[in-house]
């Protein structure tokens, strides 16, 4: 029998494993649904293709466990960053495809009683973010959480902000799933501020001179990753789960 590498957090309310009657009982108490949105995308030779997915899933499991809110099955694919190098295993959606898929999923869930959707992603590529932020429902509230919109620069040594397969991604993965990280394969590669701005907007590919990562993954540690993850979890808890959403 195959055993999953990472078991869900104890007490996480996973829709995938919940019968319809139990879903109805949970909905009567809390009509929210947490939805992790990942990518199947290279982040350099030292990280797994599911790096962004693993980070988002772990946070969603922890939040579901803490606040007893249902957590949807993971959306495993997103809008990838274009790269000048072909990475074996990469699989991406177009922005409009991801947008339409999320519209369909949320419409279906809204029809059976969910009244708020919390989309959580660890991928700050602008076309990917656009697909999430423009999702439309009939009446239900949609809240999009970009984990890397939370400032982490003071916890890093070689960068002032999150990049791609960098010190932040690698540190968090060293904390959450160290067995999946190959630090001996990590390679640093920096962009200028203008190049980074264009890259985030989807106007610049990861250069062929890069092994696939942007930033300084060589400086990553599990200790930094723990501090980053705990900050992210605290900020998301405070802003999304402990503070009432403003009336629209």
Predicted feature residues:
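Extended, histidine- and acidic-residue-enriched regions that form the cofactor-binding/catalytic faces
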Residues: 1-248
């Amino acid at each position: 029998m195959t055993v999953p590498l990472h078991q869900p957090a104890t007490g996480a309310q996973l829709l995938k494993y919940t019968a319809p009657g139990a879903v109805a009982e949970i909905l009567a108490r809390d009509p929210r649904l947490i939805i992790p949105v990942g990518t199947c995308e290279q982040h350099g030779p030292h990280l797994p293709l599911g790096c962004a997915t693993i980070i988002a899933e772990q946070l969603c499991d922890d939040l579901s466990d803490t606040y007893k809110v249902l957590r949807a099955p993971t959306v495993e694919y997103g809008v990838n960053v274009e790269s000048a190098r072909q990475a074996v295993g990469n699989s991406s959606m177009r922005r409009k495809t991801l947008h339409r898929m999320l519209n369909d999923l949320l419409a279906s869930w809204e029809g059976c009683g969910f009244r708020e959707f919390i989309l959580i992603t660890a991928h700050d590529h602008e076309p990917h973010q656009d697909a999430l932020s423009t999702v439309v429902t009939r009446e239900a509230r949609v809240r999009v959480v970009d984990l890397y919109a939370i400032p982490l620069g003071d916890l890093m040594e070689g960068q002032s902000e999150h990049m791609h397969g960098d010190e932040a991604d690698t540190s968090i993965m060293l904390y959450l799933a160290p067995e999946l990280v190959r630090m001996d394969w990590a390679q640093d590669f920096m962009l200028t501020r203008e190049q980074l701005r264009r890259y985030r907007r989807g106007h610049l590919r990861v250069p062929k001179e890069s092994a696939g990562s942007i930033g300084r993954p060589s400086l990553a540690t599990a200790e930094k990753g723990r501090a980053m993850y705990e900050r992210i979890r605290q900020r998301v808890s405070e802003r999304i789960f402990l503070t009432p959403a403003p009336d629209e």
